[in-house]
């Protein structure tokens, strides 16, 4: 192993920065010093999430912070004597077993100095990421097994004093991959070639997409540490659907479910974040190689789906996305890297949550296998929309089918009508036929009695009448008496059939007469309710006559010579009330006989009755019409609008109406207008 030169000194600030890391490092070093490869495999299998997943975001974050250039691999060949790649491979395979406790004590102090100078050199281009590393020492100290290893390998592979930033960037890029490849070899498949494992490491190293998604835009756009502190709650969002699917699929899978599910769910956000990093701004990452990351994306699209094809059929459409749509995605996502990465990550989270709600993971796999030949752009956001409408259509069509089937099967009203039509006539017809048969069979026995054709016709007509009434459903009361009569006719068949004939005919006629009388009474009662007002209007229509009409009426009575008298005195219909024998001489009519005739006709027209001395005094007579006409004779708004019914109600003369006879007497006369 190559030692650090003696000339190398670290500043006091550098040692002070990493003081919180020192108490936690020796324990972790001893864990890997004394561990053999077998025990390392067990420890890695037990803690895949703690040891494997946590270092990756930190180390990958540092890789992209440094902006790993193409020279990262070429610089490895600069030191004379040994090649960086060979030593890196040796350290990849033998680091856990070759490390010795004596060397680790030296390395521990050296690593602290190296890390101090490393962060000091990174202060100028990246102040914010330097603040992240200063403010998060506990997070680095816990998973820093791989950092310690790559620092040791950095000490081994630095025979010449190279500037610390270059050596750290080189060693971090190489040893992080090598260390994680070693962990992957122990976890997954020991016989897989190194290249495929390296590709898998590059993918799984980026598995927590929320960190990489948030780290790349924050480095490029210079986001503050406060934004990066908000990352842990974003990590917890996709973990909940992942854990629920992990429980359902742990029994059927051999690979670590969390890694595979992360690859399956969030390959698109990783791809977008990596492609967003292809052309970074010149200030922060001037030397990021495009070819190297394009190789990573192409290898991801080609090699990894072959390995995970039986478990995750959705990699096939995503492979075609890598092949078909690299250029548009580069153009779009370089313009808005942060927005695109967030959108794609949110879409995948929404897809997973929507897919988990209606279906189980097995059904999701089946639907994905069926929809593999579809274009890849559709499979992302369109899958839940395709699955959900199917479920909705099924759930909607089932109740509609039931609803459509129910009226066809049950139909209670129609069956009730059919039964009423079918069942009721049958027993009646049977009785009727039995009655005919009995009558016909008994006729020759008696010899004297025979049913005439006329009786038969009427009998059949009666049956048809019964059926028609039954079908209409109006005269159900007629059926029961008819059946009783039929039974009576059967019992009385020994007697003269003319008697039964007459009884039936009489009954039918009586029933029809009763029905007609009831209908007439109802109609008359309705007419009585509506006609009184019309009758009163017609009765007192003459009150609306003008003087010309009154003069015409006088001429019709046979007194045309008095027309001018009525016109000149303006005798209208309402003034006829006051025309009597005492008033006619004032108008110029002096003939007594003519006066009596005109007075009598006006009383008849107005229906004014003279009191009769012969009538009973049990109920004193009240001339309702006379009193009404007395009120109507006055001029005014009330008298103009007054009607007989209103007058009777207002005067309280209901008891004295001609139709009603009441014992009580009301002798008070209503007040009249002055």
Curated annotation (Swiss-Prot):
Leader sequence residues: none
GO term, biological process aspect, one: signal transduction
Alphabetized CDD domains for the sequence: SAM_Samd14
Covalent S-S links between cysteines: none
Domain spans labelled SAM: 545-608
PROSITE patterns xrefs: SAM_DOMAIN
Region annotation Disordered: where it falls in the sequence: 1-448
Gene3D superfamilies listed in its UniProt record: Transcription Factor, Ets-1 (1.10.150.50)
Cross-referenced InterPro entries: SAM, SAM/pointed_sf
Ranges annotated as biased composition (Basic and acidic residues): 87-142, 195-223, 236-274, 291-322, 330-346, 354-372, 391-429
A Pfam family the protein falls into: SAM_2
Annotated Acidic residues bias: 1-18, 276-290
One Gene Ontology term of the molecular function aspect: protein serine/threonine kinase activator activity
Domain of life: Eukaryota
PANTHER family: STERILE ALPHA MOTIF DOMAIN-CONTAINING PROTEIN 15 (PTHR46829:SF1)
Protein name: Sterile alpha motif domain-containing protein 15
Organism: Homo sapiens
Organism phylogeny: Eukaryota, Metazoa, Chordata, Craniata, Vertebrata
Gene that this sequence comes from: SAMD15
